[in-house]
């Protein structure tokens, strides 16, 4: 079963084992005796595949151990070898039953099977009443019996006992030795390390070691048969094994987080702030963007303004005029929903003893809808008003406020106001325009454009034509078509257009840029939080080095250890993300309750993005601590206090 030839172990310049050669048959009970520092524990660790010899050949169950990789050695420990340690090496957060079941988790056995086997073993060892007890609730003898049960859960063909009675009273020590003798009688191979000759005498074979060399062996040597070596088959990953890995990792991660509540919360704080920032920034951006777009919509979506000249501020635009022929041409286009003229002039408005500067806006019937003007009282202009050049006016909020400061809108309907000495009957009052980005104090009278031309200015040309494009038509294509048609009609391009969608797109692009810049700050907060997670995980690996060594000793693969710490990092980040989302919901609710300017809009995609990004942060910043844990040497890890 075990064959060692010329095994040497060196640590620096010190030779711990010197050309040790021995063989152990299946079913033997062997005691290795020696004083402290003799090399007996180092030899046991090499036999148990926890340590690697500096030179020599080691064959276990026809596998050449010195040529196996770490995971293949872990498989041998998991399937063939059971350890009984002097200090028990039970995991403090797990119950007796859970400690016993742990090697079966890594072996891929289902929950029912490993639970039944653990109960049976503990019952056989007279611990049926201690199934749910934690190690600190057990005596030394009881803890060692739990350790024995753990060594047997996967079969334990080879039991390696390192000073199993060293920390026990005499009664408990005798009980442990009796258990080992019974196990040997049942066919288990036992290798016992001790410094006590009385304990060694309980074995059927005694090997004495001193200064790394075998002094004596009570077994008579026989001719060595030719060794038959075999290659270890590739381990198949079953669904049960994967479920066991995931469940165990989540359970340990959860227990670890609960065991260090304050530290975990402080670690999560960076993630909480980062995720809350991401969600709130997106909500703020969406809310302000929606408000701006709503304002643009009220001012007129899909609208195009046609003005004379080469552009805004063109000093020669006064020499160019739009006319009614242009207006009628545009009205004939089927892809335009509405077309109307717009002109204006400045003057003085008078009511009783109040006189003030004002502007008369000559508009058509459709201008109110196109520009998003909302009526507060009365009515807007109709076709008869425009056709007959009627002296009627719709006052804006500023006009009503300055001319009729203490009266309700409906009470001033029908009254007459003078504008440049022309009387105008008030037929309507507009609501306050809250959608303008900059509030102005201009007093406006909305009158028929025909009235303005015929009775105020005498100018038959138009200052502006406003069109509204149908919803199913691209405003850009419509704008290009209008330019082409008017250019052909007028013989030259002596006008320019302003498309409201261009403004809308500029606002959207600006908001997108602002959101990205603000989101970058949130991402930086996430990265800072991730660095905090990595720091704490490195501390956690350092604190739990002994636990890692125990898990490796009972057969945990490198990927099991790595997954355990990686899932813990991801769990910390995910819990932090969930708390961050909850915090952001409270912030959004409070903001929407207190603010009337615009709402914050919670976006499901930003929440999902926050959760996914937190998991990504957990994987990225948890990888290095997890890798460090997986690369630990089992012997170094077990010796860590």
Swiss-Prot record:
Residues 2-236 form the ABC transporter domain. Non-canonical ABC transporter that contains transmembrane domains (TMD), which form a pore in the inner membrane, and an ATP-binding domain (NBD), which is responsible for energy generation. Confers resistance against macrolides. Homodimer. Belongs to the ABC transporter superfamily. Macrolide exporter (TC 3.A.1.122) family. Keywords: Antibiotic resistance, ATP-binding, Cell inner membrane, Cell membrane, Membrane, Nucleotide-binding, Translocase, Transmembrane, Transmembrane helix, Transport. InterPro entries: AAA+_ATPase, ABC3_permease_C, ABC_transporter-like_ATP-bd, ABC_transporter-like_CS, MacB-like_ATP-bd, MacB_PCD, Macrolide_Exporter_MacB, P-loop_NTPase. This is Macrolide export ATP-binding/permease protein MacB. GO terms for molecular function: ATP binding; ATP hydrolysis activity; transmembrane transporter activity. Its EC number is 7.6.2.-. GO terms for cellular component: plasma membrane. It is found in: Cell inner membrane. CDD domains: ABC_MJ0796_LolCDE_FtsE. One of its GO terms (biological process) is response to antibiotic. PANTHER family: MACROLIDE EXPORT ATP-BINDING_PERMEASE PROTEIN MACB, MEMBRANE COMPONENT OF TRANSPORTER-RELATED.
